[in-house]
Curated annotation (Swiss-Prot):
It comes from Saccharomyces cerevisiae virus L-A (ScV-L-A). One molecule or two of Gag capsid protein is replaced in the virion by Gag-Pol because the fusion protein is essential for RNA encapsidation and replication. SUPFAM superfamilies: DNA/RNA polymerases, L-A virus major coat protein. GO terms for biological process: DNA-templated transcription; viral translational frameshifting. This is Probable RNA-directed RNA polymerase.
Length: 1505
């Protein structure tokens, strides 16, 4: 609602008007200026136009059983399906309300048959309309209302009303009648739980007067006026209870006659609004209030027609469907305590706006009434193709569905997304007008019938007539071509000139007549088949805007013959004789509405109040805002396209509701500069400075990306700009709109509708849009245009409906570079980091797979082989990855990839190819649109080079750490900021109190992996050299407990050793920290990431489904801005990191043991003494700043400072910044405007927080944690990138160990193939690759095809890899683990102190009901598998002799998944050991008990968790 009003205003501040009435009517006055430009001269007329509106109407309102909506109730009392979790409610009664167990059990039995229906829309509508009627009373404007009579000298129309205005009431009274009505039985209620099945209202925050108001709104509503919102309504419930501290008796006394009407009057409008505010806020009914406000606004008023035919519109009344009332929110006192669930961001925003300015509802109703009538008329115009043809392909089915009837009309009129009502089976519709050619007969008094279709004293009107001109939403892109409603158009020459006039197309004739009437001329015409005698275009004398003539929908009328142009008595602008070839001049007409005010009667004039989006920000504290995709299509919108009207979920990429398929062929390279597409233009951006830099554009084809409109046009930097470059179009394309050097109008392209300012450059126009424009409510293509400018996409192609032209330009497609001769596969080398076990697929295997897919795919791969050979790229992993990529790439992208000069032409060698791939894909991210033309398959092409390319400059690394370029922030403000964040976590985070003994007892489970280093000789006794033994897992588990606890005595410092991490397409420096700092830090800040989960998706909250949901929540009703830090680790000063640690220590010091407090002080001091061993000189140097990548606190520190820098820079204080997510150096911000992104970059620059501008994507990609969350992949989560999947498919991570079991290998292969299937559309390629992987497994491990097949199909409880619910259990996979060989440097894990300590801890957890040695053997066996050397495991399959038992295990598989709170569960599961630490706490104790009751508790835990 708020966004619709704001979008349809002239600037970002909206004009708002309070309800007013003069006998049911008011008038909106507008001051208008129209410019006429011809012969390099400009003439203008400033004049006033007005539009009457009537509040009179008689809608038919039906109350039907609707759906129950429990949004706003605390999350913990709801099920995953959105129902009420009764068990949780009963547990709450026992635990916090002090209700005895037998009383709770009895209550549970009583409520088994109760209904849990909750819907407050009917009550909220009663309260909202009572408020508006009371405002009229206080203004002295309350009356029954009447419809004004129409009299134009030809006909007279007077429509009857039910109640005579002179005999009607003069003030609002209670809508019920105590003398005749029966009232609901209500009673005050304050107990902990209900006793009868009736609605329970929760009105605890309301005053007695406000409670009385709510009670009366539950009563029957009698219609006492003719106003549309004063509709008849039954009492909302026969019985109900209200939860309040006091028994309110005023209403009862009035009903019983103990109080007079004067003693019990309706409260003032302020009290009503206060009651409404408190009721909605306390019950958290934001979604339902949104629905109520939408419905009321849609029926509140209609425009009073200024033509006789328009009165047919007033004869049709709406059919409104409202759900019956129900309430369960007051049944229990705690249902509304805690985080509210399922609140819509759009609803929350509208609620905030309406409570700030209630006038928003009335203003929205004015705009809707105009757009509804105009849209219904345009439906017929578009459906009939301007009368020239019946367009059966034009989709207008949205008009036939009641839930989308109004929204279809709004979208048809404005070209914008029209928001739905937010609830199913709730609607406003006009059933008599479902067919666009419905006939209406208007009773009239005939004075002069010429020009009217009159039959039996009735005016016959076909379809919905035009009742008004769209002043309230002007300018509006009502058509895809230039027209008077868009704000700017050009009068073109006639089709042909005759002796007595000129012949025009129908639309051109309307444009001509419209302009002439404003200038002071009448236009006479003739059309074929006219039988009514109409000879002049009609315009009301009150506004002079000519209506769209009725004949445009007549299929028999092809052209209009303009016979004469006659000067009126009141003439304003002298124009040439436009219907004469000798005097014709091309005339450009521009219209602007300057201001608006409303008037109700002679002396009641109301000027607009203003509301600014900057001051309307939903308060999200304690509210879980969800995304539209999780509700249903009723939280979506309706959009107008060239094919018709389409409905779809808001911002839900998975449905691709607005995608259009274009027939596209790649143009020849030499042809790419001409034609309609502007693909090679020079877009300039002046540098940022204290004053705008002026540019004189002399070179053709040069356009400023950012300009400032003041008294003149200036090319400026983005920080100073008011407008940004949006599109470039040929002058001929918009010649109907403008021929001037500068002009503003509403423009509808094939992919977007937006208000633009056109600036002429030679024979083209650059279209500019205000930087403060709300881009979220525009189309995806419009956001793509903005992203291209913001990210400076050099190869972006303007004036094209598809992104494919831009791709062809960015990749510089040239078919001539494709190989003509093929020599086959070459001999390929392996990079030094690639061991045998890291490679899964090789080039020959991929070519063989391609042959099974299709000959064409094999041809594509052979082309790649030759292209790579020409570039001298012979790395096996890179070749295999690129082959896998082309094998799985969508068909439409393969040619432009193979024919790309930007990729395949240039310096030879892997590094040069990597650089070109990186440069190309970087631009592609900025033109991606998730819900229009997704390009995720082309992201991150540099990843295709896989591992082993690139290098690390250790001298540069050293320079960065000795001379750091860090963010500059005030440390006192940083401490306060971070401390507040940590304090806010105490509701959800509990600091883990422990001693050294507790900590070391569980070290087997929490010990981190990775290489181990120590600067102390005594630690080296437990560090075992060797590829498989020099790691923290072995070292820490070999150490006795006392050795670890004594580490605290060492000086506080952090020592780091350098190493290289081989990543996709690059190498990165890694700094592995010393063992002691790692263990002490982990002890002091155990699971410290959990302190951030209340605010950021880290730790357990970083799971893919949770992150995807969180990001979708954030982007509901907003767009994304991905801020990319430049080498974030190097931007932290030592002072900033020390401050963060001190804030953590001071926040949780009271929760620490003495040993933890000592360790925490050690950690704080250690960050001041950080040293790195130079790999070249082998000397230690002390860090002057920056963060070490291998530190225990890397993610924690990066996440905290990531958020803190933005907080201190003032990013979150910017008006348009709505929300953000942070994890490590990743950050995504939700916003709506280009200007906001510019201000964010500026704010971060001021504190020296560096970003990579080219990677800061605005509106295009919603990337967070390397996943595009703007669209859904095959698994229903965010879409990941094909290039990454191909790289993983070919080559393992360097850190991974050699797989020891065929089952483990096949399990990993299955996961990789599943990821690949979610990212590619070539499923046949996935099948062929799977066959190659299985073939490779049988060869390496020496197993038969039948065993591989059995492993694929058998359920996991039988040793297979299938997780299907009904996977077979008849076959069991046998693995001989005893055949593993462990390194000779280390003894058997059964003798390790860490294994013994952990086994003892688990034994104690089981209550000593399980043999200690059995537990120890299991832990030792899991440890043994981590250090095994060779593939000596024997895998066989045989018939399962205990199939019945396996069926039970299959049934219970993962039955308690998610209940175990073990932080390091993945480690345990990998070792085939169930996660055991902490499972005796919380809900996980149920899993513990279930395991103990089983015959084999260890096996049971493994299955059920």
């Amino acid at each position: 609602m708020l966004r619709f009003v704001t979008k349809n205003s002239q600037d970002k501040s909206s004009d708002l008007f309070s309800i007013c009435s003069d006998r049911g009517t008011f008038v909106a006055h507008n001051r208008v200026r129209t410019d006429f430009k011809f012969d390099n001269l400009v003439f203008n007329r400033v004049y006033g136009v007005s539009q009457k509106f009537t509040l009179v109407g008689n809608p038919t309102v039906c109350f039907n059983e609707g759906s129950s909506y429990l949004e706003g109730i605390a999350k913990k009392y709801l099920t995953l399906d959105g129902g009420l979790a009764i068990d949780n409610v009963l547990n709450e009664l026992r635990s916090t309300c002090g209700i005895p167990g037998n009383a709770v059990a009895s209550h549970a039995y009583n409520i088994t048959s109760w209904r849990w229906y909750d819907n407050h829309v009917a009550l909220l509508m009663n309260m909202l309309r009572a408020y508006h009627l009371q405002v009229l009373t206080e203004q002295g404007q309350y009356s029954a209302g009447d419809i004004p009579m129409y009299h134009d000298g030809h006909v007279k129309i007077k429509l009857p009303v039910t109640i005579d205005d002179t005999a009607g009431p003069t003030q609002f009274a209670w809508p019920s009648d105590r003398s005749t009505d029966s009232y609901p039985d209500w009673a005050q209620f304050s107990e902990s739980f209900p006793s009868i099945d009736v609605p329970y209202l929760d009105v605890r925050p309301l005053t007695v007067t406000e409670v009385n108001f709510v009670l009366m709104m539950m009563s029957k509503w009698h219609r006492r006026t003719n106003l549309a919102i004063d509709y008849e309504a039954p009492q909302l419930a026969d019985k109900f209870a209200y939860r309040h501290a006091l028994t309110v008796q005023d209403a009862d006394e009035w009903i019983e006659g103990d109080r007079t009407d004067d003693q019990f009057r309706p409260p003032s409008s302020k009290v009503m609004l206060s009651a409404l505010r408190k009721y909605v806020n306390h019950n958290r009914l934001y979604n339902q209030f949104y629905t109520a406000a939408q419905l009321l606004a849609q029926i509140m008023m209609k425009p009073v027609p200024n033509c006789a035919e328009g009165y047919a519109w007033l004869m049709h009344d709406a059919l409104v469907n409202i759900p019956k009332f129900g309430s369960i929110r007051g049944r229990y006192p705690f249902l509304l305590s805690g985080d509210a669930a399922l609140i819509q961001a759009t609803a929350l925003e509208d609620w905030s706006a309406i409570m700030a300015k209630p006038e928003l509802v009335f203003t929205y109703a004015m705009q809707v009434s105009v757009a509804l009538n105009t849209g219904l008329y345009l439906r017929r115009v578009k459906k009939t193709g301007f009368g020239t043809t019946i367009d059966d392909s034009y989709e207008d089915g949205a008009f036939l569905q009641p839930e989308t009837f109004v929204q279809a009309a709004l979208a048809c009129c404005t070209g914008q997304d029209a928001p739905l009502n937010g609830m199913s089976d709730v609607y406003v519709t006009y059933p008599d007008l479902l067919e666009f050619d419905a006939v209406t007969q208007v009773p009239i008094t005939v004075i002069e019938p010429a020009g009217y279709n009159i039959v039996d004293d009735h005016l016959v009107v076909v379809g919905v007539p035009v009742a008004c001109s769209p002043y309230m939403i002007f300018p509006v892109a009502a058509f895809d071509t230039a027209n008077p409603y868009c704000g700017n158009f050009v009068i073109k020459a006639a089709n042909k000139y005759l002796r007595k006039g000129a012949v025009y197309d129908k639309l051109e004739a309307w444009k001509l007549a419209w302009a002439l009437r404003v200038a002071g001329y009448d236009t006479h015409f003739k059309v074929y088949g006219d039988t009514h005698g109409l000879t002049k275009f009609y315009a009301d004398n009150g506004d002079t805007w000519t209506h769209i003539p009725e004949f445009v929908t007549d299929g028999d009328v092809m052209e209009v013959f303009v016979t004469a142009i006659e000067r009126r008595a009141r003439h304003f602008v002298e124009l040439p004789r436009l219907n004469s070839p000798a005097f014709f001049r091309s005339v450009e007409v521009s219209t602007t509405i300057y201001d608006t005010h409303v008037q109700a009667g002679a002396h009641a004039v109301y000027h607009a109040s203003r509301i600014n989006l900057d001051y309307v920000k939903p308060v999200s504290t304690g509210i879980q805002v969800i995304n539209a995709g999780e509700l249903k299509n009723y939280w979506g919108s309706v959009r107008r396209t060239q094919q018709g009207l389409r409905s779809g979920r808001s911002y839900d990429a998975s449905c691709n509701a607005y995608r259009r398929t274009y027939s596209w062929r790649c143009p020849r390279r030499v042809d790419r500069t001409g034609g309609q597409c502007f693909s090679r233009v020079n877009v300039i951006e002046p540098s940022h400075g204290p004053r705008p830099t002026r540019y004189i554009l002399q070179e053709p084809g040069t356009y400023p990306a950012w300009i400032r409109f003041r008294n003149r046009v200036q090319a400026v930097s983005r920080q100073k700009a008011t407008h940004f470059l949006f599109d470039i179009v040929p002058a001929a394309v918009i010649s109907d709109f403008t021929t001037s050097d500068t002009s503003s109008f509403a423009y509808k392209s094939h992919t977007y509708a937006v208000n633009v300012t056109a600036l002429r450059f030679s024979d083209t126009y650059a279209l500019y849009v205000q930087t403060d424009t709300n881009m979220t409510i525009l189309s995806p293509a419009a956001r793509r245009q903005a992203s291209a400018t913001y990210s400076q996409v050099a190869g972006f192609c303007y004036n094209t409906p598809t992104v494919m032209d831009s791709l062809a330009n960015i990749l510089d497609v040239d078919r001539n570079i494709r190989p003509k001769h093929f020599k086959g596969l070459r001999l390929y080398t392996r990079s030094k980091v690639t061991a045998q076990h890291h490679t899964h697929l090789r080039p020959d295997e991929l070519v063989e797979a391609a042959a099974k897919v299709s000959p064409r795919r094999k041809y594509y791969l052979m082309c790649v082989v030759e292209l790579l050979a020409n570039l001298q790229v012979d790395l096996e992993a890179a070749v295999a990855t690129i082959l896998a990529y082309v094998l799985t790439l969508s068909e439409k992208f393969v040619p432009i990839f193979l024919d790309s000069r930007a990729i395949w032409v240039g310096e030879p060698g892997p590094d040069a190819l990597t650089a070109r791939l990186k440069a190309s894909s970087g631009q592609i991210k900025s033109i991606h649109t998730a819900d229009y033309e997704p390009l995720t398959e082309l992201f991150e092409l540099a990843v295709l080079m896989n591992r082993g390319v690139g290098h690390v400059s250790w001298q540069a690394e050293k320079d960065h750490r000795l001379n750091p370029d860090v963010a500059v922030v005030d440390q006192a403000r940083l401490y306060s900021c971070v401390r507040d964040m940590f304090e806010g976590s105490k509701q959800t985070y509990k600091y883990p109190f422990m001693t050294w003994d507790d900590y070391t007892a569980n070290r087997w489970e929490w010990v981190p992996g990775g290489s181990v280093h120590s600067q102390y000789e005594e630690d080296n006794d437990y560090i075992y050299p060797g590829q498989y033994t020099r790691n923290k897992f072995i070292t820490v588990n070999k150490m006795p407990k006392h050795k670890i606890s004594r580490m605290i005595a060492s000086p506080p410092e952090v020592r780091a050793w350098t190493s290289t991490k081989y990543e996709w397409g690059k190498q990165r420096a890694i700094y592995g920290t010393d063992l002691r700092s790692t263990l002490i830090t982990n002890f002091a800040m155990f699971r410290c990431e959990d302190v951030l989960t209340h605010k950021f998706p880290v730790g357990d909250q970083a799971e893919a489904a949770k992150v995807h949901k969180r990001v979708n929540m954030m982007l509901d009703g907003a767009s994304s801005f991905c801020f990319d830090y430049d080498d974030f680790n190097s931007q932290h000063s030592i002072a900033s990191m020390y401050t963060v640690l001190c804030a953590f220590r001071d926040t949780f010091s009271r929760n620490m043991s003495d040993e933890q407090a000592e360790a925490m002080n050690w950690v704080c001091e250690s960050v001041r003494h950080m040293w790195v061993l130079d790999p070249d000189t082998k000397e230690w140097y002390r860090l002057q700043g920056t963060l070490l990548s291998g530190w225990r606190l890397t993610t924690f520190m990066n996440t905290v400072l990531n958020w803190a820098y933005m907080k201190l820079a003032g990013v979150f204080d910017l008006d348009d910044v709505q929300d953000s997510v942070h994890n490590g150096d990743d950050v995504m911000i939700s916003l709506n405007r280009v200007s906001t992104a510019v201000r964010i970059m500026d704010a971060m620059h001021r504190i020296n927080a560096r970003a990579q501008p080219a990677k800061c994507n605005l509106f295009s990609i919603s990337e967070f944690l390397r996943v595009e969350h703007g669209m859904s992949g095959g698994d229903g989560l965010g879409a990941q990138y094909l290039s990454r999947s191909c790289a993983t498919l070919v080559h393992s991570r360097i850190e991974s160990n050699e797989p020891l079991s065929v089952v483990r290998v096949m399990e990993a292969d299955q996961a990789r193939l599943r990821d690949l299937a979610n990212r590619t559309r070539v499923q046949s390629a996935v099948t062929a690759i799977k066959e190659q992987l299985d073939k490779r497994v049988t060869k390496i491990f020496g197993v038969g095809d039948d065993v591989v097949r059995d492993i694929h199909t058998a359920h996991r409880v039988c040793g297979g890899i299938s997780t299907d619910t009904w996977a077979p259990v008849e076959t069991k996979i046998i693995t001989d683990n005893e055949a593993y060989e462990i390194p000779y440097e280390i003894d058997d894990p059964s003798f390790w102190p860490g294994v013994n300590d952990y086994a003892y801890k688990v034994w104690k957890n089981f209550g000593e009901r399980l043999e200690f040695n059995k537990i120890k053997d299991a832990v030792a066996r899991g440890s043994r598998s981590t250090i095994a050397l060779k593939r000596k495991a024997r895998i066989t399959s045989k018939k399962n002799e205990f199939a019945n038992k396996s069926e039970w295990e299959r049934t219970m598989y993962k039955a308690y998944k998610g209940l175990a709170v073990s932080y390091y569960a993945n480690l345990s599961k990998f070792m085939s050991i169930p996660p055991m630490a902490n499972i005796e706490f919380g809900q996980a104790r149920y899993a513990m008990q279930a395991a103990l009751d089983s015959s084999d508790p260890l096996r049971a835990l493994q299955v059920i968790l």
